[in-house]
């Protein structure tokens, strides 16, 4: 179509023809300035929104914020389980979505564009949970606020206890725990009415924890531990006031609330709990589980697809068992190798928990000499190694807690040793690579040191976090840490656990498997004794979908590495690949894939 000129356009053309040269140059310059101003405005609006979003998250759930290293709200517990607070939080999220979509993404700098995409993903994911009443299930054997705060009492966890302010902050939380318990009881009563209750099996496992928290007198309470460990540097007045405060709070507020909770669980809640196993037995349970799967894997994989991936991985790893078994002196069928290993006394060499910790410390020292060849980007924050507090040992597994961003707490690898004579040695190398370095510590401590918005510095997703840690285990082979067949078996056995999780999690929550089916499958495939298979199964019952992120995330990172190696050939650098993966903190897997693909294209 032939263009036409209006009178207005002709007049403009005439004016431009007669204008001085400087005026012609001023127009583009003015346009650029306006565009730059708009871009700056978008950047300011985005940064303001990102800060508000994270602060809202931290205030809504201050305990989780503290676990992630943000100690600003260590005197608060939040009341995220209160229905009105939950509704208000979802309303906030909806407002944030509107504000986010009003910002021009293309006007942002590349790193802000990534943050924009992550925030968009997080908000959409959070809002998918709105129809499902998670607040009606505030307690399980795996986690609850009373047990978390009890674990903080020694000052070694995510709640520091070194200053008067710290002691007051923890006491403040104890004062708020009674109302939280009463809200939890009210929620669970509502859950009973609506058919949203926990499986009876996991609550029977949880009950002893809560009975144990009820003390005969304040001084016997685990929550009184800080008052028994007041630093000598505190003034006499502060010591007296703090001790009196802890004693009064426990006697008049906390202990009665804990007694109410234990009695409610035993006499009212557990009798009303369901005998079914999976999440799909709940109202809207299958839809609820699908949202959990998407959240935990950051993918659109369906349960059946994940189930089949798990079965395929189980078969692959059993093929490796067949190869490594004879090197360990085992000549039976491959599937029986884990059971045989458990029966060998030589793989249970410990007499004390300190001996276990000493092996990890030796391994940590060894890694300090090997990791620089694989990583140029490493955290500055140190990693400490500690034994798990006694209260939580029965239900805890070895794990990592992040450092405090203010430097008051290092990253910590916690070793859970219930009975040192039964602590197996074959899995120690791969476990430490996962929970310590270069697994969780390299990822999470480094993320806190990067120049990122707080919602990324302290946030994340399960598929990347656990996927990276499981991928980190595979690096043991390149560092020569699996040269002994028993150590390589330990790595394979941990891989097998993550593959089995894909099978049993989807089996129980999407395919109608019973608790007993899962226990039997784990015993046959992993060689676990009944007690361990039961506790693992009950973990997946309490945390539907959580165990899926490990293998799904790890497989994606390995896929991306193989893609980069094939595309770049001699130009491929493993330290650079690790920098690309870790260099912007946690990403949903789709965004990680785009980032690696860009690096491949730029590096060719």
Q: What name fits each language-model region?
A:
Residues 1-21:
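Gram-negative bacterial Sec-dependent N-terminal signal peptides
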Residues 24-604:
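N-terminal maturation segment of proteins
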